[in-house]
Design a protein with these regions (language model features):
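Nucleotide-state-sensitive switch-loop elements of NTP-binding domains
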Residues: 1-32
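A broad, low-specificity signal for short, low-complexity segments enriched in glycine/proline
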Residues: 8-13, 33-38, 87-92
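Generic signal for short, ordered secondary-structure residues
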Residues: 13, 20, 45, 69, ...
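Glycine-rich phosphate-binding loop used to anchor ATP phosphates in small-molecule kinases
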Residues: 21-77, 113
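Alpha-helix N-cap/loop-to-helix boundary motif
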Residues: 51, 55, 82, 102-105, ...
Length: 173
């Protein structure tokens, strides 16, 4: 993979960061095992689940690939109101032996995941919006998107701040 391809795939990283993180990024996002599993599922028309922040081209490219192969795209967007909440969630994940992220990556993911979902929401056959709140509170589903319409859960009286980006869509309560 050329450095230009890497920069397109991971636009939030500088060249120095890519050099330092390339092996980790490959393991985390584009490993051979992932591609092998994905291709087997596509070949055999099996269901496939992908966890991605949808903040870079990787998530979008995978959704486009599966869409092209005739898959229905169902998503769950876990949202937080602030980057500080996101940093706290990553810290909790690390405490539980999960992978860590650089602060620059957390900030990039926080900003660009919402923008990318917003810009490509039409790729989803169904998308559930879940407010993850904070590490001390349980997440809750408050809305679902399908066919250009966002339906709100009657059990949730308000929507979180981060959801304001999606205000242009038609709503049903």
């Amino acid at each position: 993979m050329t450095s230009e391809q890497l920069k397109q795939m991971y636009p939030m990283y500088t060249a120095d960061m890519l050099d330092d993180l390339f092996e980790k990024l490959v393991d985390d996002y584009k490993s051979k095992e992932y591609a092998k599993c994905r291709d087997i599922c596509i070949k055999n028309n099996l269901n496939f689940a992908l966890e991605t922040p949808f903040a870079d081209n990787f998530g979008l490219d995978e959704v486009l690939l599966f869409k092209k192969k005739g898959y229905s795209i169902n998503g769950i967007l876990f949202g937080l109101n602030t980057v500080e909440e996101s940093i706290a969630n990553v810290a909790l994940r690390v405490q539980k032996k999960g992978h860590d992220l650089l602060l620059e990556s957390i900030r990039w993911n926080f900003k660009h995941s919402y923008l990318n979902v917003y810009n490509h929401i039409n790729l989803f056959d169904q998308l559930h919006f879940v407010h993850a709140q904070s590490v001390a509170e349980n997440p809750f589903l408050f809305a679902s998107y399908s066919e250009g319409i966002i339906n709100f859960s009657s059990s949730q009286p308000s929507v979180p701040l981060w959801f304001s980006l999606f205000a242009q869509y038609s709503y049903k309560t």
